[in-house]
């Protein structure tokens, strides 16, 4: 896998996948998504086929993805074949450029399965290493070395993701300290095919925002990455930026009904507007008013910035419907991916991040 400027972590849900399809070709070339395949709610095989067909349609077969099957480990298709194996083999059969993702929690059978997929033609492998906010270099390196030994792969074959998960305000300093220390002493630092740093400060739920209310959340992961890229240790390799777009880390329960909300990414924060739905399925007036305030403010990127921004402007003008939470997830993700891609393009170190030293 070649270097990407940005690696968003996305769930394989309709809103996120449709947002990928709406990206312009220039933005697509700078992004390699890490897709977390969601667990099946019905027939496992049929579910996997739908997901792969959808992904092939919205992202294409020529664009790389990192395929994370962590939510599929206990599922099987007919005949007892693990769903994760079926997924990866199906992607290879469809000639999709999929990179299997391993993590330290995988048992030997899962690791061996991923090794076989790599041998069968997958474009290398990805290690996703979960780390606490106070992780020390030895903590990270032990997990990485153990996975190298278990998989039998060389660092040059591996995209390494250091995943700090959720990071909130009280953890800001500890997080910044940890990433500087871990990256300064990272094992095989110059050998990894790609080095990626991910985290998110987006909340797991929006329950603390009242209906017809609004709030903002700092993009701590972006602030920490950009600070490190500009002023980190000169000897440390600059990782590729990654985040969870406009979502929290955990997968919501299958029966969870998302609140009507607009999540809008700006330079250093997310704005969140939360509305209510009338009995006819349409958002209430207060939600439309908040959207109108955004589109007339200096913080609005403009209708040409992304599919999501065009939709938002059309909704305010009464040209677009706004009743589906899936549509608002697509709006938020579309805007976020395009916004971050532009933000990174304006960062002088972005072009060199994640890559091995010459």
Give the location of each predicted region.
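Eukaryote-skewed repeat-based solenoidal scaffolds used as protein-protein interaction platforms
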Residues: 84-248
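Alpha/beta catalytic barrel-like cores
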Residues: 1-107, 193-194, 204-358
